[in-house]
Design a protein with these regions (language model features):
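Short, conserved catalytic-motif segment at the N-terminal edge
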Residues: 43-103, 124-126, 235-239, 314, ...
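Short active-site loop at a secondary-structure junction
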Residues: 62-69, 91-154, 242-255, 331-334
Length: 460
């Protein structure tokens, strides 16, 4: 631990060693990496931390999720790191510390934002730059004057999401509507809590192929490849989408899809390659990747939804989010896979104001700007989510979280929160969308926020 920076070392010689060292010579090193410690070392109560397990067991019993990872670190010391449950409800494969989860929108703050901060550090843009300065297709649209900071604060007015997949469906392959608010013969498949869909449609053969071939290299799922020209459809759909009120809070995945495009243009490389080369590989985050099947065994990856609508298969190693899938799995809004141990290294980097393991990855000034800024009209930070003052159902955090906390949640059942006041990290990763996204018990039971409050009670 000492050699790799997991613990600090302080020591002096009380006597001289002839020809080598004089009395008083010593070694003094700082703790630069996360390491495992007993809760008592940070004055946390082990008994109160045990409450976490009871909250998780409640969620497992009520089938809010089949399994999860929970991670807590304080003062750079890991005081809680446990895996619970299974990959799915068949209970054949138990979750362990190496299990990898689809982070969903937590990717925005753990992946895309990391790349955005690096580009900002390198002076590739300013917060007041117009996004159309980097994406010229938007120059002759009503999106031309949107500032980069508007996208980061989610106050651009852009629509929450766009169903890009509709452009790949053959409209002549079915009759009637694709969606229904009630289950019937034409709409037998439940899509979410309020929507049923048909599954008798076909994809346009000039856009979707069952095998990889020239022109069809964008992988959506197993045996599904999208024509490479579809990226032009995506930017056109964004350009033509309805724009709401600028300056008013409206959470939008489109904001981060555009930020990813900006980063790739300014940094002159794909975002996944940038993040791997500049951050994940150096941090030792070997289980963190977009399109994880390129580097990890399928058996390490926790499945998300059994998709009976678009991809018609169990999604395992392929991103759950449809908008990200139709961009080949690397998107600004979703696509990153990781486990709690890997993710903690990124979060500790944020908490350390840009450094980890003795290396400075981002400037302190950039880290302070992005982690401390807050939008005037709402709770959002610069790319990060934050608590609502006073807590309550409107807040993504527990009632005991201070205002300084920043982090994000993910649709698949994930969250992470960084607390600079208490030098604290909290990570919860689950696959609550397995086997269906219609299950929202994770939210209704307040599992993530109850765990967060239990952590604060344990460290007080």
């Amino acid at each position: 631990k000492a050699i790799f920076g997991g613990i600090a070392v302080k020591g002096k010689l009380s006597v001289s060693i002839p020809t080598l060292y004089t009395a008083g010579t010593g070694v003094f090193t700082e703790k630069t990496r996360l390491g495992y410690h007993e809760p008592e070392e940070v004055e946390a109560s082990p008994e109160r931390l045990d409450v976490i397990a009871s909250i998780v067991e409640d969620g497992l019993e009520q089938k809010a999720f089949p399994g999860c990872q929970v991670f807590v670190a304080k003062d750079g010391m890991i005081i809680y790191d446990k895996s619970f449950g299974y990959f799915d409800y068949d209970k054949k494969q138990a979750v362990d510390e190496n299990s990898v989860y689809d982070l969903a929108s937590s990717s925005k703050a753990a992946g895309t934002l990391l790349a955005v901060m690096k580009a900002y550090d390198d002076k590739k843009f300013t917060l007041n730059n117009k996004i159309s300065d980097f994406i010229p297709e938007l120059k002759d649209s009503d999106k031309k004057n949107l500032a980069v900071k508007d996208l980061l604060y989610h106050q651009s007015g852009l629509t929450p999401t766009i169903n890009f997949y509709l452009n790949a469906i053959d409209k002549d392959s079915y009759k009637g509507s694709l969606y229904s608010n009630a289950k019937n013969q034409a709409h037998p498949v439940r899509f979410d809590a309020r929507t049923y869909v048909r599954n008798d449609f076909s994809f346009l053969p000039n856009l979707v192929s069952a095998r990889k071939k020239p022109g069809f290299t964008t992988e959506i799922a197993r045996n599904m490849y999208l024509h490479d020209s579809f990226k032009d459809t995506i930017i056109r759909e964004i350009k033509d989408s309805r724009l709401g009120v600028r300056g008013k809070y409206k959470y939008s995945c489109i904001n981060f899809i555009l930020l990813k495009m900006m980063v790739e243009k300014q940094m002159r490389q794909p975002m996944d390659r940038l993040l791997h080369g500049m951050f994940f590989s150096k941090l030792g985050a070997w289980h963190t990747a977009y399109n994880p099947l390129h580097i990890l065994d399928t058996m390490q990856i926790v499945p998300t939804e059994n998709d009976h609508f678009i991809r018609r298969q169990l999604l395992r190693g392929y991103v759950h989010d449809e908008a990200a899938a139709f961009q080949g799995g690397v998107s600004g809004n979703a696509g990153l896979f990781s486990n709690a141990n890997d993710l903690a290294k990124v979060l500790q980097l944020y908490l350390n104001q840009g450094s980890y393991g003795g290396e400075q990855y981002l400037s302190k000034e950039t880290c302070r700007l992005f982690t401390q800024s807050k939008s005037p009209p709402c709770r959002r930070g610069l790319g990060f989510d934050k608590p609502v003052a006073g807590g309550g159902k409107a807040s993504p955090c527990g009632s005991l979280a201070p205002a300084s906390v920043y982090g994000h949640t993910g649709f698949t059942g994930t969250c992470f929160w960084v607390d600079p006041d208490n030098n604290l990290l909290y990570i919860f990763l689950s696959n609550r969308v397995n086997p269906t996204r219609a299950n929202n018990k994770l939210g209704s039971l307040d599992i993530r926020t109850r765990i967060q409050d239990a952590i604060y009670k344990a460290i007080k």
